[in-house]
Amino acid sequence: METELIKDRSLSSCIKTANNLLGVNFAKTIKGTWLPALLIAIMTAILGFSILQSLHSFSPTIPEYDLFPMALGIVSWLGSIALWAYFFASVVNLVSESSFKQNLRRSFAITAVELIFYLVMMAIGGAIIRMVVMSYINKPLTPSFFTLVGGISLAWILLTALLMVPFRYAEMRYLLSPTGSLRRNLIAYYVSGVRGSGLLIGSSFFTALASICLGLVIFLPTIILLGAKTSSLIGELTLNDPSGLPTYFNALFIGSLVLTTFIFMMVMVWTVFVFYYAYGSIEHRRQMKKQRQAATAE
């Protein structure tokens, strides 16, 4: 793909350029990303089906709790993370001069770092919540307690999301630098991302908002099917009614989830392109700053 990466761009310019890149090269994008997108769609369908099946675990007609859907869900979640690294490498490979093998290896490495960082943040947040709960162990659980726990949880989630933003720059810098070392340069990459956090936060907010809005439209058939399943289950549990769903409902649900997820992955391609150009803009500003400092030193 022909791209003009290193250039000073505003958020709106990054979005517009990403739109143009995807629109002009849509066929090439599909060709380069269809396999990981399909695998993610299948994995999402497995995860969705496991959640669907776990709803029966709460039915009084089933005497024992079925752990299989839960185990399947955990495996699917971990598999989805690995497939996302594969998908991300495939998207970057469209605009990178490096080999796909190198992009894939680096994508797995930076994804593993991000996952570890996320899990550490969640563990710290869980420990804080536990300390708050333990402080109320011998006290009545008033509405203020639930407000406090909810407020702390929300604040920690927002803090974690904010601290994850600089990784959007770090992952692009790492994959697009032919000789960059993650072990030696991770902190430097992250700090550069912090310095360009204004553009990255704006890109994160807009792409998240756009993804949510488009996702609600794309996943509407699946949402309707899930609502039908929930209504049927409520009738079974409260009124002892027989299930009114057709025998092919599970196949219909899985097929719908695979198709809608595959379509949604094209939205994810667009978000990667937005951060690609945001990275280019931050790099341009960083290089211009270095040149000004060098000129001043002379």
Where are these regions (language model features)?
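Nonpolar helix-loop interface/hinge motif
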Residues: 1-56, 157-235
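Juxtamembrane transition segments at transmembrane-helix termini in multipass membrane proteins
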Residues: 5, 63, 87-100, 163-183, ...
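Central hydrophobic cores of alpha-helical transmembrane segments in multi-pass inner-membrane proteins
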Residues: 12, 78-91
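Hydrophobic alpha-helical transmembrane segments
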Residues: 15, 30-31, 74-75, 108, ...
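Cytosolic-side membrane-entry/anchor segment at the start of a transmembrane helix
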Residues: 19-33, 89-121
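Membrane-helix interface segments in multi-pass membrane proteins
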Residues: 43-80, 122-160, 215-265
